[in-house]
């Protein structure tokens, strides 16, 4: 019954030479140094030798060329020029970067090119000049205010010495924060000048709004002055000090009668 089963690998009628002979044959061929050992033509060896010699000669020529560059003054001068040019451009870029940082914040939002930086700077210079003019004007106004305040403090801190010797009388009444009504009474036999009072008040930054004068039967003169003073920070109008100041201007500084 088993004889009827065909063999797994039929030999097709060829005689068997052994179970593993073919494998040994293949191993011997692979281990043999002559496997794929085809003869190489002599022209191939010559070409390889020529390429090797050419590479060696090329390396020598490159090295010699480098030495020639180092010893060539024209090449050295050109290299130095290129280095100087790079340094010059680096400095210029640094200067334009500094100029760009001086522009307003709107001009620093993005990196401007060199022409754009120059154009924006030329437009910004007149703006700065206008701001400088405004600041100078504001400074002058502040100096005028400070000077007026000092003048006011001067006569407030230096009242007349001989108040009791004055012949005339002065009374001041406040009408508002910067308004006052002043009445002067004096004898007409004394040659006092009201113009000196007005000049002194003008120096003290008082403005004369209205003025009137009258004469009584008792040979006395009366002057009524309505004054305004410019508003100065931290300055409070003192009627008593103003009265003393006007007495000083009216009697001690008077030269003629008007």
From Swiss-Prot:
It comes from the Eukaryota. One of its GO terms (molecular function) is DNA-binding transcription factor activity. The lineage of its organism: Eukaryota, Viridiplantae, Streptophyta, Embryophyta, Tracheophyta. This is Transcription factor ORG3. Induction: Induced by OBP3, auxin and salicylic acid (SA). Repressed by jasmonic acid (JA). Up regulated by iron deficiency in roots and leaves, as well as by nickel, high zinc or high copper treatments. Repressed by high iron, low copper and low zinc treatments. The keyword Nucleus applies. Homodimer. Its main location: nucleus. Keywords: DNA-binding, Nucleus, Transcription, Transcription regulation. The keyword Transcription regulation applies. InterPro entries: bHLH_dom (IPR011598), HLH_DNA-bd_sf (IPR036638), MASH1/Ascl1a-like (IPR015660). GO terms for cellular component: nucleus. PANTHER family: ACHAETE-SCUTE TRANSCRIPTION FACTOR-RELATED, TRANSCRIPTION FACTOR ORG2-RELATED.
């Amino acid at each position: 019954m088993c004889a009827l089963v065909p063999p797994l690998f039929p030999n097709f009628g060829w005689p068997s030479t052994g179970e593993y002979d073919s494998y040994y044959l293949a191993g011997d061929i692979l281990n043999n140094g002559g496997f794929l050992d085809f003869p190489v033509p002599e022209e191939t060896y010559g070409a390889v030798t020529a390429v090797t010699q050419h590479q060696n000669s090329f390396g020598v020529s490159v090295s010699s060329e480098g030495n020639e560059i180092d010893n060539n003054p024209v090449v050295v001068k050109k290299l130095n020029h290129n280095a100087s040019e790079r340094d010059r451009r680096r400095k210029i870029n640094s200067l334009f970067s500094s100029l760009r940082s001086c522009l307003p914040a709107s001009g620093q939002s993005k990196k401007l090119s060199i022409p754009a930086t120059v154009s924006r700077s030329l437009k910004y210079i007149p703006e700065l000049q206008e701001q400088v003019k405004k600041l100078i004007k504001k400074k002058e106004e502040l100096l005028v205010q400070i000077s007026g305040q000092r003048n006011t403090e001067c006569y407030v801190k230096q009242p007349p010495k001989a108040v009791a010797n004055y012949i005339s009388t002065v009374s001041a009444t406040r009408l508002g924060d910067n308004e006052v009504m002043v009445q002067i009474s004096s004898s007409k036999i004394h040659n006092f000048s009201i113009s000196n009072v007005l000049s002194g008040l003008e120096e003290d930054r008082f403005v004369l709004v209205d003025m009137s004068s009258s004469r009584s039967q008792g040979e006395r003169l009366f002057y009524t002055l309505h004054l305004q003073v410019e508003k100065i920070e931290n300055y409070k109008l003192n009627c008593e000090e103003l009265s003393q100041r006007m007495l000083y201007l009216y009697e001690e500084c008077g030269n003629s009668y008007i």
